[in-house]
Amino acid sequence: MDFLNSSDQNLTSEELLHRMPSKILVSLTLSGLALMTTTINSLVIAAIIVTRKLHHPANYLICSLAVTDFLVAVLVMPFSIVYIVRESWIMGQVLCDIWLSVDIICCTCSILHLSAIALDRYRAITDAVEYARKRTPKQAGIMITIVWIISVFISMPPLFWRHQGTSRDDECIIKHDHIVSTIYSTFGAFYIPLVLILILYYKIYKAAKTLYHKRQASRIAKEELNGQVLLESGEKSIKMVSTTYVPEKSLSDPSTDFDKIHNTVKSPRCKLRHEKSWRRQKISGTRERKAATTLGLILGAFVICWLPFFVKELVVNVCEKCKISEEMANFLAWLGYLNSLINPLIYTIFNEDFKKAFQKLVRCQY
């Protein structure tokens, strides 16, 4: 069969020749994204499987997310590329039904995995002691199973409604002619998980911030107490040497180097304690900023990738007069698919164990 679809038959040779470079460029770009998504998610899955240090219930959720995103890259993206380049569906309605089913289920499952990971992290930081006992591989398996079951229940009704209307043989889309079906699918697959993720990560950030401040206050109090004990026990050994005469006005002179003057109130030990305290406060602040950055990247990537698509789905299918070009619809769909490439990067790039595991895999040292 000719590479160009039937709609191209009415075009002149010059028009076909003019459109060919853009189609090749689109095909290569999307194929590159699909290949990158497949490779990166494969690395995450392999790293968790072969690295014993990564055999942790929290990482099982990340592994399941990587499997879901891998399926998007292997089973969804290639068919979408062919559909976009040819501008018509040529693989029959049976394969269309299978493709749409896998597309909706996997994308919904990927989004729900993000909710499950957020819930897991929230419980781990707010109920650390009790949840550490409950956080077992079995519990992670139950969460993963529930996520897949919910994804299927959310995805099936839109596919059912699709067969209630008439579909052309050269198209493979879901027309949400029923407002109930549109609201059910969009809210179940995105809007409700979005609200849940926003609430959970806000609470995680607040809890982490409070925890950092409590630890910081506890360390400072402990160091102050240790400093007092050191002063009392070492009072006799501290020499108050005054070999240099310093006038009173020099105390306010910024050029005076107080570190070299021996007749100061603080002992070297107290100064060392103060410096350690300051360094720990700095480390605590750095960790807090790192946590905020990580959460910001997770939420930002999720919202940027999926919000435009689901806004389009809701508006276009509820508002009869609202139309969108096929090119824009394809762009928004692939913007959502892009989240499957970003997910493994965000959830592993800040983890040193994952970095080391990736290096071993690349060097074949596993």
From Swiss-Prot:
The keyword Glycoprotein applies. It is found in: Cell membrane. It is a multi-pass membrane protein. Glycans are attached at residues 5, 10. One of its GO terms (molecular function) is G protein-coupled serotonin receptor activity. InterPro entries: 5HT1F_rcpt (IPR000450), 5HT_rcpt (IPR002231), GPCR_Rhodpsn (IPR000276), GPCR_Rhodpsn_7TM (IPR017452). One of its GO terms (biological process) is adenylate cyclase-activating adrenergic receptor signaling pathway. Disulfide bonds join 96-172. Residues 50-59, 120-139, 203-291, 351-366 are cytoplasmic. The chain crosses the membrane at residues 25-49, 60-81, 97-119, 140-159, 179-202, 292-315, 328-350. Keywords: Cell membrane, Disulfide bond, G-protein coupled receptor, Glycoprotein, Membrane, Receptor, Transducer, Transmembrane, Transmembrane helix. CDD domains: 7tmA_5-HT1F (cd15334). A motif (NPxxY motif) lies at residues 343-347. Residues 1-24, 82-96, 160-178, 316-327 are extracellular. It comes from the Eukaryota. A motif (DRY motif) lies at residues 120-122. GO terms for cellular component: plasma membrane. Serotonin binds at residues 103, 107. SMART domains: 7TM_GPCR_Srsx. Its main location: membrane. Belongs to the G-protein coupled receptor 1 family. G-protein coupled receptor for 5-hydroxytryptamine (serotonin). Also functions as a receptor for various alkaloids and psychoactive substances. Ligand binding causes a conformation change that triggers signaling via guanine nucleotide-binding proteins (G proteins) and modulates the activity of downstream effectors, such as adenylate cyclase. HTR1F is coupled to G(i)/G(o) G alpha proteins and mediates inhibitory neurotransmission by inhibiting adenylate cyclase activity. This is 5-hydroxytryptamine receptor 1F. The gene is HTR1F.
